[in-house]
Amino acid sequence: MTKLLVVDDEKNIRKLYETELTREGYDVVTVESAEDALEKLETDPPDLIVLDIRLEGMDGIDCLRTIMEKRRDLPVILNSAYSTYKQDFASWMADAYVVKSADLSELKTTIVECLEKRGKA
């Protein structure tokens, strides 16, 4: 089963993503901080990460840079409520950028595309 790591400091977002993505057949692990995500990367590596940009403590961009230093092969989807970041995601070495929405269809499609692109589907 494909394992996804969702990193978001908002509990309701983590719960929504966990519920909806589990329904899609994924094994979903959620954490609330970049630091927790980096720990999971070492102890229970995912197949893909959905990473919020604005996090308490270390932000999502610094977390992404650390992830890329360790696991360049790991697909990462940046996820934020702010569409203004969309133009910058490629320069940050993320695979995709999805604006947060109650409708998760774009996120679900992007997850499939990123996994297929990286040969992990």
Segments and roles (model prediction):
Residues 14, 56:
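The feature encodes the CheY-like receiver
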Residues 102-115, 119:
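C-terminal output helix
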Residues 33, 59-62:
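Acidic catalytic/metal-coordinating carboxylates
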Residues 15-23:
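Charged docking surfaces used in two-component/phosphorelay signaling
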Residues 25-32, 40:
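Short hydrophobic/Thr-rich beta-strand motif most characteristic of the beta2 strand and flanking loop
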Residues 39, 61-72:
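Short amphipathic alpha-helix used as the core "switch/output" element in two-component signaling
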Residues 52:
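Active-site residues of response regulator receiver
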